[in-house]
Design a protein with these regions (language model features):
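Short S/T/G/P-rich N-terminal loop/turn motif that feeds into the first structured element of a domain
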Residues: 1-73, 84-102
Length: 102
């Protein structure tokens, strides 16, 4: 079964939103295509209740996520340009094989 990877960054979500719809739009589209080719199932940027940046991904396995994330220098550049200065907090969840999944 797949995993959900939730990564939280100490940076305002609004900063990244401006970047991914502006000067880094082509970069995120290229990253999306590479992620799909590497097995990504879902990917969204989100804003938590404190206005901080979150990324929620679904991958076939944690190893597949780590292999992709660790080989994409464009990701590090993107988060740096969004004002991220410290390491993210990542939590992984195993997605249950439940009959009501959408």
């Amino acid at each position: 079964m797949s995993v959900m990877v939730v990564t939280k960054f100490d940076a305002p979500a609004s900063a990244l939103e401006e970047l991914v719809t502006g000067r880094h739009k082509e970069t995120v589209l290229q990253l999306r295509d590479a992620a799909v080719a590497a097995g990504a199932i879902r990917h969204v940027f989100a804003e938590d209740t404190d206005g901080k940046l979150m990324v929620v991904d679904e991958w076939p396995s944690l190893e597949a996520f780590q292999a992709f994330f660790g080989t994409q220098p464009a990701i590090q550049q993107l988060v740096a340009d969004a004002g991220v200065t410290g390491p993210p907090t990542t939590t992984t969840y195993r997605i249950l094989d439940a009959p009501d999944r959408i």
